[in-house]
């Protein structure tokens, strides 16, 4: 039985005080009883340590929104997976559509980042998904398959124990549009089939696949009820503590 996983991607939102306040409120609303699903939050790099101080020793795990594919060196402005791991991070989000769109990240770059993160025992949430134009052109599956195979290239079955895939249809991110549970389930099942082909049935059955794309309190329970949807990568709704906690409870 796969354990549901809800992660909040705060993107470039919340200054230091705002991040600490939001993390504190989420903890308070969750209460003393640990959630039955796994939970992580990904603040900006600047707020990582302050947020870690708030959630340390709680059930909430610290995640990062990106990393570079080298451990150290003359890479101005970059943060390495090793630095994140040494600062208390347990997860890193890689290949998010906004990274692909605004920073020209390719599947090859995502793959290098995935490998580097895994090499320092930092678990990965690898994002894949199609644009509206690609969906309307009927190439959703070929786009997603290329991203999955490219991002997971040269990984082992053992590596896959530390990988989560997030399916995020680009046309549903921050637009208010959401894939129907049936649309999302179809792609999630397809992704699981690709992973089965690459790594075998056991790895595919154990892989958690999150859905990301305008997940809200009103649709979370129905989405998470689909057989191949194992939680969510939450954007805008994760910036509101009450909404985020309600979504977490939808996954329990």
Swiss-Prot record:
This is Triosephosphate isomerase. One of its GO terms (molecular function) is triose-phosphate isomerase activity. It holds the Pfam family TIM. It is an enzyme of class 5 (isomerase). One of its GO terms (cellular component) is cytosol. Homodimer. HAMAP family: TIM_B. Its EC number is 5.3.1.1. The keyword Isomerase applies. InterPro entries: Aldolase_TIM, TIM_sf, TrioseP_Isoase_bac/euk, Triosephosphate_isomerase, Triosephosphate_isomerase_AS. Substrate binds at residues 9-11, 174, 214, 235-236. Pathway: Carbohydrate biosynthesis; gluconeogenesis; Carbohydrate degradation; glycolysis; D-glyceraldehyde 3-phosphate from glycerone phosphate: step 1/1. Involved in the gluconeogenesis. Catalyzes stereospecifically the conversion of dihydroxyacetone phosphate (DHAP) to D-glyceraldehyde-3-phosphate (G3P). It comes from Chloroherpeton thalassium (strain ATCC 35110 / GB-78). It is found in: Cytoplasm.
